[in-house]
Amino acid sequence: LSEGFDGNIAYKQRIGEVDLTVRANMTYSKNEIKEYDEENSRYPYKMKYGFRVDQARGLIAEGLFKDYEEIRNRPSQGSGIMPGDIKYKDVNGDGVINGDDEVPIGATTRPNLIYGFGISAQWKGFDINVHFQGAGKSSFFIDGFTVYPFQEKSWGNILTDVVGNYWSLGINEDPNAKYPRLSYGGNSNNYRASTYWLRNGSYIRLKNVELGYSIPKRFVNKLHLDRVRLYLMGTNLLTFSDFKLWDPELGSSNGQQYPLSRTVTIGLTVGI
């Protein structure tokens, strides 16, 4: 079952010698799975029925283990668990952390809200156009080599954000550290989809700004031209988001895609 709305609005007004246009658009949708061919589960949260399409799912992280005593006194998460590893909530209370403890978390992995708004104005020969765009009500997981340094015994650089923010024995034993302990090789416990790696995909971006000046006709006509306009245009100038590691508009889990470029262009338009 899906429902939502899509709309746009524009308002034009002349104020003195200024021609002003304000515009906005928005697409919003929500859905719920009412019928799905799946086996019944003893845990209703494991089923798709009753939840949203593309609902993010994973374990509920409860910080990092501080010592071996805490590891022994917590539900089993498998072998090889060490201080600094992510600890998870035993949702079904069976004393073991496994797939039965994965629950719907966050929002959907596709934005349920997409919007934009802007303003345009003309005054004498000058003009300006500003446009913002954004997305909301979405979640995504960060993963891969970007946030799991040295996985599978690989070599490479570490993000600046990881350096100084990961759990380290005797250096940074904060149970709420931004990153778990580093390990050379695989660490399946820390790589699991969970609230630890879940991020808010909402953002708003200053997508386009254009400033222009059209030379008066009385000068242009002397050059046997129809019009001449100078302009300065910027694209992807500012982004406002809680997520700072890479461009949230990419929808990337690891930031390894080529980012959208910030560009500034100076141009001249000539009409013959």
Regions found by a protein language model. Give the residues of each.
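C-terminal beta-signal and terminal closure region of outer-membrane beta-barrel proteins
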Residues: L1-S2, Y43-E69, V162, S168-D174, ...
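Repeated loop/turn-to-beta-strand initiation elements of outer-membrane beta-barrel proteins
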Residues: F5, E17, G125-N129, R218-F219
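Hydrophobic, lipid-facing positions within transmembrane beta-strands of outer-membrane proteins
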Residues: E3-G7, L113-I119, F126, L206-V209, ...
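Outer-envelope beta-barrel architecture signal
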Residues: G16-V22, L113, K124-F126, S202, ...
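Conserved small-residue
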Residues: K12-T109, P149, N157-T160, W167-N172
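Membrane-embedded beta-strand positions of outer-membrane beta-barrel proteins
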Residues: G7, V22-A24, V130, L230-L232, ...
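Transmembrane beta-strands of outer-membrane beta-barrel pores
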Residues: E3, Q13, M26-E32, W123-G125, ...
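Extracytoplasmic gating/loop element in the C-terminal half of outer-membrane beta-barrel translocons
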Residues: A135-R229
